[in-house]
Curated annotation (Swiss-Prot):
Keywords: Hydrolase. CDD domains: HAMP (cd06225). One of its GO terms (biological process) is signal transduction. The gene is icfG. This is Protein IcfG. It comes from Synechocystis sp. (strain ATCC 27184 / PCC 6803 / Kazusa).
Length: 634
């Protein structure tokens, strides 16, 4: 009997296996799609909430930045000579030109301490009822700028006003105010533009008193409304955030901390229709996948049911082992040098496993490096002084702008008893966590050895001096003892940690608060400047080597007097070595020119130098910390 080589299709084992696979595949797949649909709905809702929350944060950033720029611009106006001198003609000209140049959508008013209108921009004289005298007293009482809502009969007539003090040039006494007001419709237009860019359906902004500043649902505003009693607004003003679903829309309530940390409110709203449409699309894709997967499974099972099942099972075991963390699991899928897709898949799987091992190792290494940098940055910040001494006849200011990687810059200012002020600025060699830790060690040793932690009447005796209250040179010896902290710190670091080759350049000065006498040691640091209104008066150059290089080093003490109206400026090489995008150094000469030109700013001159440095660097990489300290004698 001749063997039948071709079996009927319906009787083939491949048909039976494929049919069985499809029967086993389709019901669970449909059930899985149902579960995925439910899960997807929740996830899409969560994603939509996160997206709405992110957009709210972005809007808050835009509003906050706009508010800061507005405050800075008004403060700039208040500092102009014409404004300070109450020059009516010059003030009015400046205000109009400022508004024209910046395309300002409000007006400015200048008032004296009696609340009398001195000058104003065009159109400001038409504004009646501004409580200028009351605002002057409020600003003077709080000693800072203020923001106030000036309600009108209608929303269009209501204004948001910023009040900034005007200080005299001589003694910084408040002599008047600059009032800058913006109509609420201008703010509403600004919010409307944000709405368009953010692709939202509604934005509602209320101030800390519950007044609606902007609501994009309204095209024509009537009276100024207060929604403080509204449940949603009440939640916002009580600093409560969250999501609200109502009538096919969902909203995010976000408190906003503006203007002296007062709580404003922001509500952003979107439609749920996009979420439902996305869920429907997922369902369609799911059912389409059922058909596609079913066809692929049927075809693959029919063609390679045996030839492919075993190696796929091997790959499944390998994937489970890798998922469990066994990256050394041996994959034998291609021992026979298969050239088909299974062989390629096996090679790809092996390559993927090796890549995962490499990426994990690199990620661990990068994570360790990031952790080290973050710890170093935290160490640096924790060792810097939280606050600077507040003295009647002295002004102290400091600036510390860390680079992207940690290093060893530090500064300090502390009282030695009731009569002396210690000023320190230094730079530890090298970078990284090690430099940050040694920075903390140097700073702590200087404080301890100088007697900062001792009672005010304690005299720590030096090997060369015996201090006595009756000694005519007792004051001098006490100062020598304070500065002796540099020698003690040097000997300790060089002796106990010499193998680490860590040292620091530093300037340590002790100022007699009563008469301005300065005694100091400059241990290999950048020259410290003493300047007055005529320019650089003294350069306090190095009087000894860097601290920590060699034990028993000699450190010479120099002294001079800081007269009233003079200022001490200390800095690290991160200032002079700051590079522009064209690799040009900021340089000591430019630093001295900036100091001379801006001496009248007193200790605020550091902020001017900082802005000069930011402009000079212009976005290029900052390789070193920028550290400065200023001490001005009134």
């Amino acid at each position: 009997m001749k063997m039948k080589l071709i079996q009927p299709f319906i009787q083939s084992i491949r048909f039976r296996i494929v049919g069985l696979l499809l029967l086993c595949l389709i019901p669970p797949t449909l059930g899985g799609i149902f579960l995925i649909d439910s899960y997807t709905g929740r996830q899409l809702k969560k994603i939509a909430e996160q997206d709405l929350q992110s957009r709210a944060r972005l809007i808050i950033q835009l509003i906050s930045r706009s508010d800061r720029e507005r405050q800075q611009s008004t403060a700039f106006v208040a500092s102009q000579p014409a404004i300070v001198e109450f020059n009516v003609e010059a003030s009015q000209y400046f205000l109009n030109e400022f508004i024209k140049f910046h395309q300002w959508n409000g007006f400015f008013v200048v008032a004296n301490q009696e609340g009398e209108l001195v000058a104003g921009s065009d159109g400001a004289n038409q504004e009646k009822g501004l409580p200028l005298k009351h605002w002057f007293e409020e600003v003077k009482d709080k000693n800072r700028h203020l923001n106030r809502l000036f309600p009108g009969k209608t929303y269009a007539e209501s204004k948001d006003c910023l009040i900034v003090p005007i200080h005299s040039k001589n003694d910084q006494t408040q002599i008047g105010i600059v009032v800058e007001c913006i109509p609420l419709p201008v703010i509403a237009d600004f919010v409307q533009k944000i709405l368009k860019d953010a692709e939202l359906e509604r934005i509602l902004l209320v101030n800390y008193e519950g007044y609606i500043y902007a609501d994009t649902d309204f095209k024509n505003y009537g009276v100024l409304e207060n929604k403080k009693k509204s449940p949603l607004v009440n939640r916002l003003l009580n600093d409560q955030s969250g999501f609200v679903y109502s009538q096919g829309k969902f909203s995010y309530l976000s408190p906003v901390h503006l203007r002296g940390a007062k709580t404003w409110g922001l509500i952003v709203e979107n439609s749920e229709s996009d979420i439902q449409a996305a869920i429907l699309n997922v369902n369609r894709i799911g059912y389409l996948l059922v058909l596609v997967i079913g066809g692929i499974v049927a075809y693959a099972s029919w063609m390679v049911i045996h030839h492919s099942t075993v190696p796929i099972l091997d790959l499944t075991k390998a994937s489970q082992a890798i998922a469990a963390g066994d990256l050394d699991y041996e994959i034998n899928i291609n021992q026979g040098n298969r050239q088909d897709e299974i062989g390629i898949l096996g090679n790809s799987f092996i390559y993927m496993k090796n890549q995962i091992k490499t990426l994990i190792a690199q990620e661990v290494k990068d994570g360790v490096n990031r952790l080290e940098l973050e710890k170093g940055r935290q160490i640096q910040q924790n060792f810097l002084p939280i606050s600077l001494p507040d003295l009647q006849q002295w002004q102290i200011n400091a600036v510390f702008e860390p680079a992207r990687s940690v290093s060893g810059d530090f500064y300090d200012a502390f009282l030695l008893g009731d009569d002396y002020l210690a000023i320190v600025i230094g730079d530890v060699c090298d970078k990284g966590v090690g430099a940050a830790m040694f920075m903390g060690l140097f700073r702590s040793l200087l404080r301890v050895f100088s007697g900062e932690t001792m009672p005010g009447d304690t005299c720590i005796r030096d090997v060369n001096y015996k201090c006595s209250a009756n000694d005519g040179n007792g004051k001098k010896k006490v100062i020598v003892q304070f500065l002796n902290a540099v020698r003690l710190t040097n000997d300790y670091i060089a002796t106990e940690h010499g193998d680490m080759a860590m040292f620091a350049t530093l300037f340590f000065g002790v100022i007699d608060i009563s008469n301005g006498n300065l005694s100091y040691i400059n241990a290999g640091h950048e020259p410290v400047f003493i300047l007055n209104s005529e320019g650089i008066k003294h350069r306090l150059k190095s009087t000894g080597p860097a601290v920590g290089m060699m034990p028993n080093s000699t450190f010479t003490i120099d002294s001079l007097k800081i007269d009233p109206g003079e200022m001490l400026i200390g800095y690290t090489d991160g200032v002079t070595d700051a590079r522009s995008p064209t690799k040009e150094f900021f340089g000591r000469q430019r630093l001295m020119e900036t100091l001379t030109a801006n001496f009248s700013a007193k200790t605020e001159i550091l902020d001017i130098i900082k802005q000069e440095l930011i402009g000079h660097i212009d976005g290029s990489i900052q390789f070193d910390d920028i550290t400065m300290i200023a001490v001005y004698r009134n």
